[in-house]
Amino acid sequence: MDLSRALLIAALGAVIALPFAVEAQRPLPSGWQLEAGLSGHVAGYNGDIGHKGRYGVLSDTQWHLVQGGVGLHLRGHQRGKRTGFNLDIRQIRIQGADSASNNAIAFVRNLHFRNEMTEIAATADWPLLRLGGRLGGWTLGHQFRLQGGFALLHHAPQARVDVDNLCYDVLTELGYTTHGQWHDLRSLRTEGIDYAEWVMTVPIGLSWTFTADPGTGKPWHITLRGLWRITRTDHLDDIHDRYADPWKMSPLGLAFSSQANPDDLPPCAQMPNISTYQYQQGSNSQAIRGNADTRDAYWTVGITVAKSLTSTPTQAFHKQRFRGHRVENKR
């Protein structure tokens, strides 16, 4: 079991046990309200591999490679305050492939990756719009919020050896790989450098929350949330700068460093020589493999379903969300 899955399972156990712990303890001090739930999302990536090769643009996403994921959610806010605080643990998968790019240079480069990541995010949210009312015995509310904060991300890019790779037959014969096998790229040092598996990111985005309380004081919350992550790394896709010296790599690392081959050249296209996409012995300026001036980004759009774990007094619940006098039916 890899580290990402272990962290997710541990967090799931903690969230499952949390309601029982809260019930067993006295109410939180200073009127804090707590809610916990599960989330599902789709995730995309923007970096050195894209639909058209435009960095940091949502339209550059390869939409057919968007991946699904799940997460755990915990939110707390102090009664009467507008700011809420969120703790989220998400399993996020991103993926990209030059073979699906409309950019001819990227197409011939023929690199690809997938990255199964674990994100631990601490964010704050601020309501931009709040609406509410009643429907029968239910108290309903809508909140449109701005959200932002910091996150710790564990990532591990992987790739498979292309069956058209010039080294494929030799690698399979020697037992370095099998058909369809995914390999960890960071340990293979495909650009001759090391990079961190834990990085800091900045999630920022918007959310809309629908709240429904059947009269128990413990409302349900359904949230639609979209978050964009700003990162300081250019290695989520294992593509950063230039082709590295193959003599300093393992055979498998060499295969992943350059996956370009003659079979990738489009017919009738005026393309550079295949040597453009590999290390040049004795050259003072090596061929560019990626854009070192940019940083990778990723995003998620998903739904969270959560339930309040601590009771909110009915009167306080109304006063907090709905301004004005309460009207009682005297009849």
List each model region and its residues.
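Extracellular loop and loop/strand-boundary signature of outer-membrane beta-barrel proteins
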Residues: 54-62, 105-113, 117, 133-134, ...
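Surface-exposed strand-loop-strand hairpins of Gram-negative outer-membrane beta-barrel proteins
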Residues: 42-73
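Gram-negative (and chloroplast) outer-membrane scaffold detector with strong preference
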Residues: 79-180
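Transmembrane beta-strands of outer-membrane beta-barrel pores
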Residues: 40-46, 89-95, 128, 150-156, ...
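Short loop/turn motifs that connect adjacent beta-strands in outer-membrane beta-barrel proteins
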Residues: 24-33, 79-82, 129-143, 212-222, ...
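Predominantly the C-terminal beta-signal and adjacent terminal strand-loop region
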Residues: 213-331
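Residues that define the transmembrane beta-barrel architecture of outer-membrane proteins
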Residues: 32, 64-70, 116-120, 142, ...
